């Protein structure tokens, strides 16, 4: 069942440099940005991953991997598994829901769902506005809304999330595990999942081949 999860509070981003690929300073938080895994990433769960940071503060960080499909399951099938509908053919999903991707959002709480969506949809006490017109909702109500045609225009559903303890993400960035850059809705919600990693690098002016050759020196 999709349920609300604890997450660190959003931090003050006033001192953040947009599009910065280097280390971050203490108190300079990355919610609303993308993390891009470096080729030296040893954890296979995050290899070539692009992660949208939903919350980052002194309490830690939480994000959703936006380029890792959850096998062959699609959104209508998931609605059946969650008992929102009995059969996919019983409902007529709007076009954006028919193509809605189900992703592996990360290794934490993989039995729970988290919906990243455009900011044209809001549920009081459930929706977290993040940045650049992107919000996060983690209740089953948003799935019912999408199924009935009353949901957000753009959305992706992720099973699980990526989480970091206090200071852990900062350390990984300093150790050249991640690059980071500004996010945009077209990249986050795009259907070209296989291209998201290269597109994120291009936002920093980096060619993937060049990054591979210079791993650890970005």
Swiss-Prot record:
InterPro entries (UniProt xref): AlgH-like
Region span, Disordered: 1-26
SUPFAM superfamilies according to UniProt: VC0467-like
Pfam family, one: DUF179
GO cellular component, one term: cytosol
Annotated Gene3D superfamilies: VC0467-like (3.40.1740.10)
Cysteines joined through disulfide linkages: none
Annotated NCBIfam families: PRK00228.1-4
PANTHER family per the UniProt record, alphabetical: UNCHARACTERIZED PROTEIN YQGE, UPF0301 PROTEIN YQGE
Similarity remark: Belongs to the UPF0301 (AlgH) family.
HAMAP family per UniProt: UPF0301
Protein name, per record: UPF0301 protein RPB_4502
Annotated source species: Rhodopseudomonas palustris (strain HaA2)
Biological classification of the source: Bacteria, Pseudomonadati, Pseudomonadota, Alphaproteobacteria, Hyphomicrobiales
């Amino acid at each position: 069942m999709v349920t609300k999860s604890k997450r660190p509070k959003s931090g003050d981003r006033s001192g953040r440099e947009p599009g910065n690929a280097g280390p971050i300073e203490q108190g300079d938080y990355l919610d609303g940005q993308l993390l891009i895994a470096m080729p030296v990433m040893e954890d296979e769960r995050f290899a070539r991953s692009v992660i949208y940071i939903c919350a980052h503060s002194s309490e830690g960080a939480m994000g959703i991997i936006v380029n890792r499909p959850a096998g062959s399951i699609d959104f209508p099938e998931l609605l059946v598994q969650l008992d929102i509908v009995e059969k996919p053919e019983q409902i007529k999903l709007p076009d954006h829901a028919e193509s809605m991707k189900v992703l592996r959002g990360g290794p934490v709480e993989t039995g729970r769902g988290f919906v990243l969506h455009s900011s044209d949809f809001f549920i009081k006490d459930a929706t977290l506005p993040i940045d650049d017109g992107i919000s996060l909702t983690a209740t089953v109500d948003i799935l019912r809304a999408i199924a009935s045609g009353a949901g957000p225009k753009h959305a992706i559903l992720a099973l699980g999330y990526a989480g970091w303890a206090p200071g852990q993400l900062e350390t990984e960035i300093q150790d050249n595990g991640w690059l980071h850059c500004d996010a945009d809705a077209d990249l986050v919600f795009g259907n070209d999942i296989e291209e998201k990693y290269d597109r994120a690098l291009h936002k920093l002016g980096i060619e993937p081949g060049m990054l591979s050759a210079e791993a650890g020196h970005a």
